[in-house]
Amino acid sequence: MELQSGVSEVADSPAALEKAYPNLRHLRLLEAAQRCGALTTAAEGVHISQPAASQAMIRLSNQFGGKLLERHGNGVFATDRGMIVISRTRRILDLVRSFSQGVSRRLRSDRPKRGGSLESHLTVSHLKAMCFVGRAGSFSSAARALGQSEPSVQRAAREIEGIIGLQLFSGGLRRVQLTQSGLDFSKLASLVLKELDSAYEEVREFDGAYDGRLIIGTLPLARTRIVPDAVVALSQKYPEATIGVLDGTYEGLLQSLETGNIDVLVGALRGKIMHSGLKQKRLFEDRLVIVSGKGHPLAGRHELTREDLANSRWVLPRRGTPTRHLFETLVGDGNLKGVIETGSLVALRGILTQSNFLTIISQRQIYYELQAGLLEVLPFSLEGSERPIGLTTRADWQPTALQADFLSALETAIMPV
């Protein structure tokens, strides 16, 4: 197993750099052939000659490691391997068609300016260019990331802008700003590339090789024990898999989730998620406790009062986080002076063990510190501090077997404190 960790800003998957992705028109041909049962009819529908269609199927079969179509009688039928690829292709077509419908509404017409559908003009070069321009913020940085010349990246990006018929960029060559339409297409490009990655990974799984990728976004509560325990269990089952564990702000991780840069986000759930393309699943309820370093003056008390807490110094998460909001509701911080704000467990541990500061935190986050006797829980019940912990995914996410097994490992890793 290869384990990667970092922050959400470095979540760019190298898959788009490493793979020779299939031709999107060839995938449309495969999907149409399975749907109508005839390669000739499918070729006419995607405007490919019969000889070219036959060559396209040979090339696709080579790319995906085996036959995708078989001829029986007068028709063609998809193999099991072929259906894996077709399933992902249909998800790609749904994404592209949904985007095209949005474009049509903005243009108040039923087709993009150049008179053809985005579906028929879209290429992998367009996807890569827009995906990486969106991430890097400039044509030059995107070109370096892709290992291409800057003019070729610019050409692909400007070409898709013309096909769509909406302005995708503002600003100059050195630093480009994506318009809302540009952001939307960059997200589409990233998700389509993700589906292509998943098609390859599922075919590999079909062949018994579980060497795919799983990228996990983590919020504070999940980073210490829940996700690590699940990752260890998963790596024992799939030693060839690459697993990335990323942290970052909630907003940054949500954006990475929406664009397919991470597969699942684990941590405290928000009451109402503002992103329509995402969904939450509750796994368990967690409670907060008041914690100090070993030997704190309040640690030997059998009972604490709110006055004791009000007269103490605190290390707290930044304002706007769920834990800080609960602290303000349950304890109040109107008169607190000299508060230290940090989201770093390492910094928090160092401060508490060397001072008389207090903090409010989940016991699950400091499991190892409690076991080592570095910190201790103070006798003050925070009634009403329960909060749901779970996972957030894209609403239409179709996980690979590796990714689905992580969800099972995650539920197993949820042990009582």
Describe the residue ranges of each PLM region.
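Central regulatory/effector-binding core of bacterial HTH transcription factors
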Residues: 136, 141-151, 155, 212-270
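Hydrophobic hinge/microswitch elements
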Residues: 249, 258-262, 268, 326-376
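Short helix-boundary/capping micro-motifs
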Residues: 33-47, 133-145
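Secondary-structure junction motif
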Residues: 298-299, 312-333, 399-409, 417
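A short LG(V/I)-centered, amphipathic sequence patch enriched
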Residues: 61-78, 161-178
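Interdomain hinge and pocket-entrance segments immediately C-terminal to HTH DNA-binding domains
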Residues: 103-126, 206-223, 238-241, 287
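Short beta-strand-centered segments that line the small-molecule binding cleft or hinge
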Residues: 2, 121, 206, 251-288, ...
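A late-sequence structural motif
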Residues: 376-417
